[in-house]
């Protein structure tokens, strides 16, 4: 077992996870298989991964500081929000990976989440204001436009009904460990291809959970409709088929979503976090 991991290992794992997600054909989202037609480019995401990684993995920082510094580095580099959701999910994982306490990654992560402070909330609110994410709106409780007087975990509890990233904070990243990582391992066994496995993870999230970015922007009915469409695509997906045949159905779904302006961004964020967690687990056991 090779832990605790170094800051360099964690930064590299995060950077690689971000790039691997771009290599996956993710219908409706940014990827290398088509034109940059969701308002952001692959190059923006590559730059974001490069500049955010050192801040996310810096030793000795709180979760909130990791979030704020990573988001500020990103906005300063590319001029707009590309990775707020990714950073929100990845910062606690980075803290857990750098923690020298006993236990596995999931157990240490639970302790990190339970220990989130008011200071973490203040740093995170500042990051969200800096990023100016789309579809956020105003919340009746603990709105990010003001200064929080609750811990970050308490703020996430208030948001969990409308935001799946917040839900994962309050449920110890259940989506990542019980859905994402299980599907990733299964898909890797089927295809031995990380991009194909990442596509499978993304589709599993989209088919299993209404995407909350779509829900915030277009309503829950639209998110549920996309979820049903994703279920049909996932049912037809064959990781053992040749790439051309496999991608034909995925590209048709991709074009349909983009023609309607529907970007399942939360599903993509969960996919990056899954790839990051998989790499951290592999590093910890020396694989």
Language-model regions, residue ranges each:
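Amphipathic alpha-helical interaction segments
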Residues: 69, 88-92, 197-204, 271-272
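Long, hydrophobic/aromatic-enriched structural stretches that serve as scaffold segments
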Residues: 54-103
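Phosphate-rich cofactor/ligand-interacting catalytic cores and adjacent structured alpha/beta frameworks
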Residues: 1-61, 97-255, 259, 281-287
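Conserved phosphate/anionic-ligand binding catalytic regions in large, soluble enzymes, centered on
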Residues: 78-92, 260-276
């Amino acid at each position: 077992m090779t832990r605790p991991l170094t800051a360099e290992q964690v930064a590299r794992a995060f950077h690689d996870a971000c790039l691997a997600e771009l290599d996956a054909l993710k219908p409706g989202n940014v990827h290398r298989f088509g034109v940059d037609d969701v308002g952001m480019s692959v190059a923006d995401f590559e730059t974001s991964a490069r500049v955010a990684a050192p801040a996310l993995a810096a030793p000795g920082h709180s979760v909130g500081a990791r979030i704020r510094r990573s988001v500020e580095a990103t906005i300063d580099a590319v001029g707009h929000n590309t990775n707020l959701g990714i950073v929100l999910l990845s910062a606690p994982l980075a803290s857990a990976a750098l923690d020298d306490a006993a236990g596995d990654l999931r157990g240490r992560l639970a302790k990190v989440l339970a220990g989130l402070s008011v200071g973490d909330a203040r740093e995170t609110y500042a990051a969200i204001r800096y990023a100016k994410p789309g579809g956020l709106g105003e919340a009746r409780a603990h709105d990010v436009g003001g200064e929080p007087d609750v811990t970050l975990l308490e703020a996430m509890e208030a948001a969990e009904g409308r935001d799946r990233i917040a839900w994962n904070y309050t449920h110890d990243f259940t989506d990542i460990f019980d859905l994402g990582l299980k599907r990733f391992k299964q898909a890797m066994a089927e295809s031995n291809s990380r991009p194909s496995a990442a596509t499978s993870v993304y589709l599993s999230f989209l088919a299993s959970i209404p995407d909350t970015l779509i829900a915030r922007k277009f309503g829950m009915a639209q998110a549920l409709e996309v979820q049903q469409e994703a279920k049909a695509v996932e049912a037809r997906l064959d990781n053992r088929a040749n790439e051309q045949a496999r991608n034909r159905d995925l590209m048709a779904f991709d074009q349909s979503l983009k023609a309607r302006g529907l970007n399942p961004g939360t599903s993509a964020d969960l996919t990056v976090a899954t790839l990051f967690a998989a790499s951290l687990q592999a590093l910890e056991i020396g694989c």
